[in-house]
Curated annotation (Swiss-Prot):
Segments forming domain Phytocyanin: 1-96
Binding site for Cu cation: H39, C79, H84, M89
Name under which the protein is recorded: Basic blue protein
InterPro entries found in the cross-reference section: BlueCu_1_BS, Cupredoxin, Phytocyanin-like, Phytocyanin_dom, Plantacyanin
Annotated source species: Cucumis sativus (Cucumber)
Amino acid sequence: AVYVVGGSGGWTFNTESWPKGKRFRAGDILLFNYNPXMHNVVVVNQGGFSTCNTPAGAKVYTSGRDQIKLPKGQSYFICNFPGHCQSGMKIAVNAL
């Protein structure tokens, strides 16, 4: 399945609650739609998600229309533009 992160609003502030109530499976695609001049998508670990810090070597997506295939287990994504993750621009997704 393909999921548009944030729905019609796209990847933006206060998307932290977007995954609630959805069932994700390994191999599902998350589609992140955003303005690449204003946001990005960074794959982080749980610590990076909690603290909004980007771990060294983290994968960064910047196209504005990123398709990311979910691995099994927990995945964490943030925007690391200053202050954005702190404003709820982050999601944690568990794929079965």
